[in-house]
Amino acid sequence: MKEETIFFFKEDTQYQLRQRAEIRTWLNTIAKKEKYSILELNYIFCSDEYLLQMNRDFLDHDYYTDIITFDNSEVKGKIEGDIFISIDRVKDNAQLQHSTVKDELHRVLAHGLLHLTGYKDKTTKEKEMMRAKEDASLSLRKF
């Protein structure tokens, strides 16, 4: 059996992720499509306040966000990283986007992974590409 390389944690939230095995398989599929492999990827689900403090401490940003991705990779094509996701933001964004919490969470899971494969989202063009990649990633789900 393959050793797990994708881990899920929580900080300052009671959120329980469902379908972990299916999500791991799906995330590995996304990475492979981008010609990457995952050495170690940690997803940490947290509250708005927890992620706001991280945003202040590490990025010097004083606003809420749904995700912060830290790239710890040392070798090109081999993903190592920590992705912090605010469950509060995901729930709010799902309502704003007229989406389900599950779909919005999956979009954000893919978004963080795509950052680790080199995609950015600062410019309008980058945001459009990121959204297209997120949509393509969501279409790969088999669950």
From Swiss-Prot:
Taxonomic superkingdom: Bacteria
Swiss-Prot/TrEMBL cofactor(s): Zn(2+)
Any GO BP: rRNA processing
Cofactor remark: Binds 1 zinc ion.
InterPro entries the UniProt entry points to: MetalPrtase_cat_dom_sf_prd, YbeY
Swiss-Prot/TrEMBL keywords: Cytoplasm, Endonuclease, Hydrolase, Metal-binding, Nuclease, Ribosome biogenesis, rRNA processing, Zinc
Location in the cell: Cytoplasm
Entry's EC annotation: 3.1.-.-
Record-linked Gene3D superfamilies: Metalloproteases ('zincins'), catalytic domain
A single cellular component GO annotation: cytoplasm
GO molecular function, one term: RNA endonuclease activity
Entry coiled-coil feature ranges: none
Role played: Single strand-specific metallo-endoribonuclease involved in late-stage 70S ribosome quality control and in maturation of the 3' terminus of the 16S rRNA.
PANTHER family membership: ENDORIBONUCLEASE YBEY, CHLOROPLASTIC
Protein name: Endoribonuclease YbeY
Species assigned in the record: Cytophaga hutchinsonii (strain ATCC 33406 / DSM 1761 / CIP 103989 / NBRC 15051 / NCIMB 9469 / D465)
